[in-house]
């Protein structure tokens, strides 16, 4: 008989079992006997049977729970991420299963209520980068027209607090129309904002009273406390992961990869988080985040 998922229960049910149907807390009976699944409870209020996995990432999954947890640990402990192929090899999963499993874990890491970054006395750097394959490696019919330095790549715009959190966004184009709503909703008005001399970032930075920029085009990278080194360091980690670990990330899935990299950065060792802490905290995100295979657009190539 499979063991009862006691550790998962302790993490998700700190105050006792929670009925997913009526919400009653700590008013359930653990069903005993060989005819019942391990960890099966019955709510004393509505009489609904349930386990700790109902309403979570793991609900109705044929993958054993210990493999879900092992895959999560592998992804949380690797600074540049781990490909689905590698996860599958290590855990004995098929290519399709490991690909979908990894995307479900990434989905659980996405922030549901982002809130504000920065604030009074806080410094935030913001900039854009571009990720994706080289145009010369694509079939002629799929190449995009030349124009900017990001031709054929996907645009990522990010905000990073000095010694704090990062939040990155996949945007269709780096312009004020796409970015202004993001800043309005996620960047506190009293924040000290540092950017480079790029037209879009500089223009948006002017919306904040305490804004300064450095001009990379003339070799100016640091001027006192004014620089964008923090966000460039994050972009370096992101690109090494995208290019070196995953090799190819499709447009429709990029937001989930960004969620993964953001999460690891926000729960990094420099902020006092160990691999075990990062893993444990990630478990809290599995509730209410069931990603179906159809929602991943049933991509044909499961390369990452």
In which residue ranges do the predicted regions lie?
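Residue-level recognition of single "structural anchor" positions
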Residues: 1-304
């Amino acid at each position: 008989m499979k063991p009862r998922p006691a550790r998962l229960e302790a993490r998700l049910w700190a105050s006792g079992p929670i009925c997913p149907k009526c919400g009653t807390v700590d008013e359930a009976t653990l069903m005993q006997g060989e005819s019942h699944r391990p960890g099966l409870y019955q709510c004393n209020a509505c009489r609904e049977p349930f386990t700790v996995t109902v309403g979570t990432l793991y609900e109705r999954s044929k993958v054993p729970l210990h493999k879900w947890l092992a895959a999560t640990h592998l992804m949380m402990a690797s600074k540049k991420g781990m490909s689905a192929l590698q996860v599958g090899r290590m855990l004995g999963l098929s290519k399709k299963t490991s690909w979908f499993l990894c995307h479900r874990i990434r989905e659980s890491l996405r922030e549901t209520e982002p809130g504000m970054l920065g604030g009074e006395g806080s410094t935030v750097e913001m900039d854009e980068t571009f990720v994706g394959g080289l145009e010369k490696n694509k079939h002629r019919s799929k190449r995009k027209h030349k124009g900017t330095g990001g031709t054929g790549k996907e645009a990522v715009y990010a905000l990073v607090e000095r010694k704090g959190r990062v939040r990155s966004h996949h945007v269709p184009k780096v312009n004020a129309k796409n970015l202004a709503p993001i800043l309005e909703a996620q960047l506190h008005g009293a924040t000290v904002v540092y950017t480079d001399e790029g037209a879009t970032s500089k223009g948006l930075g002017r919306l904040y009273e305490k804004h300064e920029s450095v001009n990379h085009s003339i070799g100016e990278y640091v001027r006192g406390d004014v620089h964008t080194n923090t966000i460039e360091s994050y972009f370096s980690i992101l690109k090494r992961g995208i290019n070196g670990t995953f090799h190819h990330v499709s447009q429709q899935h990029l937001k989930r990869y960004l969620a993964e990299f953001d999460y690891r950065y926000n729960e990094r060792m420099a902020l006092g988080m160990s691999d075990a802490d990062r893993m444990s905290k990630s478990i809290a995100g599995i509730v209410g985040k069931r990603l179906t295979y159809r929602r991943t657009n049933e991509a044909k190539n499961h390369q990452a």
